[in-house]
């Protein structure tokens, strides 16, 4: 049962519109890593307050936290300098799963709340990709399965029960709503699905936060 959900614009965007820009900021500013770490931890703590309020609870009721992220975000939130990920060979400082007290990295929850970070895989294939693989389990199927996780960074997984391949590619700031006139992050009101009627070729779309589909004519005009 999902008791509450919340999201927030990535506050690190003021230090760079994409991942590599943020790493460049850290390289050029001695205090950069600390600023990015403080920004994301503050945002996460704000989300905890929102979630607790929506669930009619208190942040002290949060006992376990699971965290997944792309490698740069993973390193930043843990207080690890991400500069090694800014140039080849894009080496991770750590790829291990992490189990620690949330308070150790400044997260506001129950004083003894545990923080579980899934392991990063390699290079720019992070704990978010590991979470997708665990959830979808493409390595358990006889048939070949393609999983595409598109965000600020895109991971592509191709696997069956004999072999698993994964790669990563930057997608730029578009998926955070930057440098495009009508973009926004994946929150309520954003278009999440589009279907084309096979007979009429008319499109319809579904937005996050709504169970209804719309065939508003304006959408057709926008697409054309």
What are these model-predicted stretches?
Residues 2-78, 84-87, 116:
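N-terminal glycine/serine-rich phosphate-binding loop of ATP-dependent small-molecule kinases
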